[in-house]
Amino acid sequence: MGSRRKQKTEKSMIQNLYWKQVFRSPKTKIGLMVVIIFALAAIFAPVLAPHDPLLVDVSIKLKNPSAAYPLGTDQLGRCILSRLLWGSRYSLSYSFTVLLITVCVGVPIVLFAGYVGGKIDSIIMRIIDVFMAMPVFIVALAIAGTVGASGAHLILSLSVVSWAEYARLARALTLQEKNKNYMTALKAGGCGHARIIFRHVLRNILPSVIALATMEIGSIILSIAGFSFIGLGVQAPTPEWGIMLSDSKSYIQTYPRLMFYPGILIMIIVLAFNYLGEGIQNGTDKK
């Protein structure tokens, strides 16, 4: 009983030390605060948005900021603030969907393959190499040309080419864990393979996977906005940041604020996720 209590205390101390290490940097705290603000804006967009983001009223197009329209209106008379708030919902939900698919596909496969080794591991690695060699633009173009451009198809494109990166990292970490002394002790103690993989190996590699995922969200947001900007992703009139940039590119000289608002939000959220990811990675490296 005393031994278990001591182990729990030691585990709690290690976890507390880890989180202190993660949030030691002011940049990490700032990144987390910004991410929380954007997440809340996305969740409560229907409540916070002063107008319908799809409502067109050309009689008030390109209106300057006012009490009714805090950031003004776009070229079709739509409320810019409302579209930005709803845009955060689309950008974050699409990004987290891609992330969830890639992690759930990439990590479990190589956990088993890396632990078992042999031919299975070799085959999985060759498959990973093939997917790592796929350029995301060509895949997105092929899918858009075959079944049409949409948000769902963009998620599919990004997931197809992104899962291999997580799989490769998870495999390398699994091989490291596999060769550690505690693995021999677990096997000698009669611990089953499934328990070793999911209770011990997965738990130990998870912080590094989370760190990569946090930093990759920024890249995914940029990809979604970029592909939507060139017409291979989310389609108009959806209030997505890349679409807003695309719609306003003709007004860059006369009404630069139309491009400034979505552009600055993309920059801020990408930096926030990068800062947060760096903090998690630093905590993982020093754990």
Task: Say what each PLM segment does.
Residues 1-36, 275-287:
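Transmembrane alpha-helical segments of polytopic membrane transport and secretion proteins
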Residues 33, 41-76, 230-238:
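Hydrophobic alpha-helical transmembrane segments of membrane transport/permease proteins
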Residues 70, 74, 105, 114-177, ...:
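Generic hydrophobic transmembrane alpha-helix motif, especially the helices
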Residues 78-93, 117-125, 179, 184-211:
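Amphipathic cytosolic juxtamembrane alpha-helices at the membrane-cytosol interface
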Residues 80-115, 269:
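Transmembrane alpha-helix signature in integral membrane proteins
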Residues 89-105, 140, 194-226, 273:
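Transmembrane alpha-helices
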Residues 144-146, 158, 173-174, 222-265:
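Glycine-rich helix-loop "coupling/hinge" segments at transmembrane-helix boundaries
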Residues 161, 207-217, 256-287:
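C-terminal transmembrane helix and the adjacent membrane-cytosol boundary/short C-terminal tail
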